[in-house]
Swiss-Prot record:
Superkingdom field: Bacteria
UniProt xrefs under HAMAP family: Smg
Stated name of the protein: Protein Smg homolog
Pfam families registered for this protein in UniProt: DUF494
Residue ranges of coiled coil: none
Membership in a protein family: Belongs to the Smg family.
């Protein structure tokens, strides 16, 4: 049995959300599909809560990118996100893939996962899901999606 929130989220993203973003599915049919795929109802519920929290934090319009101070990580964030993860977030922000608000949303959603540590691949999926849910982030999402599925990363222009 698959038992992590991230596993449920990745399954949803790969099998439902990325296939046809315009197709609306009700929660019950999604839950039934997830149960048939082997996920526990408890983890499915946590994944839906995670998605609900992401949707609640979605801005109504895209905000302009503003350079700001460097993010200082603390306690639990340092424990959960290793130096590669933190460096990747800095890279994304410096290259304007993420703005400061999106970075904070990525951090919030990463910290909400019930895992002690996230590796870089896990964090990339969180970034991809956050960008998927952001208005005006289509180019950033497309770039990030390319990075996820290419053997050699594409340079940022």
């Amino acid at each position: 049995m698959k038992e992590s929130i991230l596993d449920v989220l990745l399954y949803l993203f790969e099998h439902y959300f990325s296939e046809d973003a315009d197709l609306v599915r009700d929660r019950d049919s999604l839950q039934n599909g997830l149960i048939q795929a082997g996920f526990s109802p408890a983890e499915i519920s946590k994944a839906f809560d995670w998605l609900d929290a992401l949707a609640e934090q979605r801005p109504s319009v895209a905000r302009p990118h503003v350079d700001g101070p460097v993010r200082i990580y603390h306690g639990p964030e340092l424990d959960k996100l290793d130096v590669d993860c933190r460096g990747f977030l800095l890279f994304l922000e410096q290259h304007r893939i993420l703005d400061a608000d999106q970075r904070e949303l990525v951090l919030d959603r990463a910290m909400a996962l019930d895992q002690d540590e996230l590796d870089l691949d896990d964090l990339k999926w969180v970034v991809l899901m956050v960008l998927f849910n952001q208005p005006g982030a289509e180019a950033a999402y497309a770039w990030m999606e390319t990075q996820m599925f290419l053997d050699e990363p594409e340079p940022v222009h």
